[in-house]
Amino acid sequence: MNVKELRNQDVSTLNETLIKLLKKHFELRMQHKSAQLDDASKLGKTKRSIAQVKTIIRQKQV
């Protein structure tokens, strides 16, 4: 998801997106531990997306 698109969303939608990303990150970590993950860069990309969403949520709260 694009940062511009994230900035246009309200906080409740961002929280839902954050929950989805956290679940996805957990699943990717489990796949990585069991050697089923083909592309390990997905972990980093998901982690970065989580950080972006958290940052935007915090900016909207202030």
UniProtKB/Swiss-Prot annotation:
GO MF assignments: structural constituent of ribosome
Spans through the membrane: none
Pfam families: Ribosomal_L29 (PF00831)
GO CC term, one of those recorded: ribosome
Keyword Chloroplast: no
Keywords: Ribonucleoprotein, Ribosomal protein
Keyword Ribosomal protein (UniProt): yes
CDD domains: Ribosomal_L29_HIP (cd00427)
One BP annotation, GO: translation
Xref: InterPro entries: Ribosomal_uL29, Ribosomal_uL29_sf
UniProt-listed NCBIfam families: L29
Family assignment from sequence similarity: Belongs to the universal ribosomal protein uL29 family.
HAMAP family per the UniProt record, alphabetical: Ribosomal_uL29
Record-given protein name: Large ribosomal subunit protein uL29
Organism: Ruthia magnifica subsp. Calyptogena magnifica
Gene designation per UniProt: rpmC
